[in-house]
Amino acid sequence: MSRLTHIDERGAARMVDVSGKAETAREATAACHVTMRAETLALVTEGTAKKGDVLATARIAGIMAAKRTSELIPLCHPLAIAGVTLELEPDAALPGIRIAATVKTTGPTGVEMEALTAASVAALTVYDMLKAAEREMRIEGLRVIRKSGGKSGDFRQE
């Protein structure tokens, strides 16, 4: 038996069969941040970015991305997502935007990939909406910070 669940005994890629797994409540939160100059962050906090409301647009993009994860990530199961929330917080200390995406479902497999996809697409949207003002922005620190439910149990890191 392979240690990698998406690789069979012959080394071929496969989609894991989750049909025999119990449906349980599952939740995952992923986080990252976009660093930028203070002047660029001011465009967000003052609502003067040329492309419009950066935080609202990034929030919607992240939600849409979570729902499309199985179309973007090979071998990722399509899931019935129960909820997606995105927190986008301007942080003058970075300076930049802190992003956290939480995804919930009840099903046989976890939602870590959906949370990671939501956070990363929200960050990409922030970059896209502000790139005319600053090309040196950086998307950093993408990681799962919390996961609950399923056979492997709970996980937490900050």
Curated annotation (Swiss-Prot):
Pathway: Cofactor biosynthesis; molybdopterin biosynthesis. Substrate binds at L75, C76, H77, M113, E114. It catalyses: (8S)-3',8-cyclo-7,8-dihydroguanosine 5'-triphosphate = cyclic pyranopterin phosphate + diphosphate. InterPro entries: MoaC, MoaC_bact/euk, MoaC_sf, MoCo_biosynth_MoaA/MoaC, Mopterin_CF_biosynth-C_dom. SUPFAM superfamilies: Molybdenum cofactor biosynthesis protein C, MoaC. Keywords: Lyase, Molybdenum cofactor biosynthesis. It is an enzyme of class 4 (lyase). Catalyzes the conversion of (8S)-3',8-cyclo-7,8-dihydroguanosine 5'-triphosphate to cyclic pyranopterin monophosphate (cPMP). This is Cyclic pyranopterin monophosphate synthase. The lineage of its organism: Bacteria, Pseudomonadati, Pseudomonadota, Alphaproteobacteria, Acetobacterales.
